[in-house]
A protein has these predicted regions:
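Active-site substrate-recognition segment that forms the wall
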Residues: 203-335
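Dinucleotide-binding Rossmann-like beta1-alpha1 core, especially the glycine-rich loop
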Residues: 50-135
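Glycine-rich FAD pyrophosphate-binding loop
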Residues: 26-47
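C-terminal catalytic lobe of FAD-dependent flavoproteins
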Residues: 296-391
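Core beta-strand elements of the Rossmann-like FAD/NAD(P) dinucleotide-binding domain
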Residues: 5-7, 191-200
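Short hydrophobic core segments
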Residues: 12, 196-208
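Helix-loop-beta segment of a Rossmann-like dinucleotide-binding subdomain
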Residues: 99, 129-170, 273, 335-343
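A conserved short coil-to-beta-strand element within the FAD-binding core of flavoproteins
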Residues: 171-188
Length: 391
């Protein structure tokens, strides 16, 4: 193996954002090296609910921000990729649900009026009843209203597996990362003692970007973390449900997605307002008690007597901005050879890749032939959180 590896683009951080970018670059003929310090998708990606949303929940205020516009095209782009016809061939990736749903438990229809009048959702929402209802809501006791959103839910472990296949021989496991300078110019990184020179270096390590920026002596952009305290429940009586349950506020009262556990049972993964500030402040036992009470109030016909429970704390990493508001698009900052980015949302991974490709094009960076990476350590796949926490 040569003492110095040369590549067009060196990417650090193999979550969905880094893996998607890597696959796009390789498809366009660029040589790449993608470095991961732990496991593929093991940071934020595999803790995500897998919802590829088009911003519908952001329009709940009736006030449409830039977010809904920027994110509106994402479901179409993902769907095309999953059909094997898009910017990447993701055919074979498991789709958990063709749609995500909005459900109002029957007491609150008020905030739906302005919501459906907003252009964010016009033409993208249909009311469903009877047999069209999600399986978990098909019960005579269910009195609410349910709307189908033109959004989809992917099985993130299967997505990571496919993106890892598309990475070919470009993946490299590496823990210790130092900058390589020529004079004052950053020309590459030293990864566990291996020197890698690159035309461009992209940091897409989510929460790991903070330490990387520190190691490179870069003070801007700064990162912020928005914490969540998610709840997982597994049981033989659970049926698939992919839905935002509306409360009175601008955020969904609870967001439920359903995932296949290794033992064949379904796991409900609960986020939404439940997992936000009040939930973050609770201890795990208290958070589980609140989640249980919510499910018993909203879905009283579901027998939870044999259910297993766990909670999971997740930090959403994103560029720092005033007021800890939600970022509206994938973020990319470019400083000579270095690009620093946060997609901020699973759904925005294609937008993140667009921004990097556009920057490469603007900088006149073109593919150059490079030798394949051989005889290097490869990062392992991460274990899905529901199998880790509820074995």
């Amino acid at each position: 193996m040569p003492s110095v590896i040369s590549t067009d683009v060196l990417i650090v951080g193999a979550g969905v954002a880094g893996l998607w970018l890597n696959a796009r670059l390789r498809r366009q003929g660029f040589s790449t090296v993608l470095v991961e310090s732990a496991s593929l998708g093991g940071g934020q990606s595999l803790k995500s609910q897998g919802i590829i949303h088009g911003g519908a929940k952001y329009a709940l205020h009736g006030a449409l921000s830039g977010a809904s516009e920027a994110i509106a095209d994402m479901p179409r782009r993902w769907r095309e990729a999953l059909d094997g016809k898009g910017e990447l061939d993701l055919s074979g990736v498991r789709l958990l649900s063709e749609a995500h749903y909005l459900w109002s438990p029957g007491t609150i229809a008020g905030n739906l009026t302005s919501f459906f009048a907003s252009k964010a959702v016009r033409g993208r929402v249909d009311q469903v009843k009877g047999e069209q209802l999600p399986p978990a809501l098909q019960n005579p006791k269910f009195k609410g209203k349910v709307y189908r959103l033109a959004e989809l839910v992917v099985d993130v472990p299967s997505l990571i597996g496919r993106l890892a296949e598309l990475a070919g021989d470009s993946l490299l496991a590496g823990q210790h990362i130092e900058p390589l300078f020529e004079g004052d110019e950053l020309i590459g990184l030293r990864v566990d003692g291996r020197d890698i020179h690159a035309q461009r270096i992209v940091l897409s390590a989510g929460g790991g970007n903070a330490d990387l920026l520190n190691a490179l002596g870069v003070s801007q952009p700064q990162m912020q973390r928005r914490p969540l305290h998610m709840v997982l429940v597994k049981g033989p009586t659970l049926k698939p449900l992919y839905a935002h349950c509306l409360g009175g506020g601008p955020k969904p009262r609870i967001t439920v997605t359903t995932h296949p556990a290794a033992d064949g049972q379904w796991v409900w993964y609960l986020g939404g307002d439940l997992a936000e500030a009040d939930g973050v402040a609770r201890q795990p036992d208290a958070q589980i008690a609140v989640a249980r009470k919510e499910l018993e109030a909203l879905l009283p016909w579901v027998d939870l007597s044999q259910a297993q429970w766990a909670t999971l704390r997740v930090d959403r990493a994103e560029p720092a901005q005033s007021g800890l508001v939600r970022p509206d698009n994938a973020f990319l900052d470019s400083q000579q050879r270095l690009m620093i980015g946060w997609p901020t949302k699973l759904a925005l991974a294609p937008d993140f890749a667009d921004r990097v490709l556009s920057q490469l094009s603007g900088d006149g960076i073109h593919p150059t032939p490079q030798a394949a990476l051989s005889d290097v350590p490869r990062p392992p796949m991460a274990i899905p959180v529901w199998d880790e926490l509820l074995p």
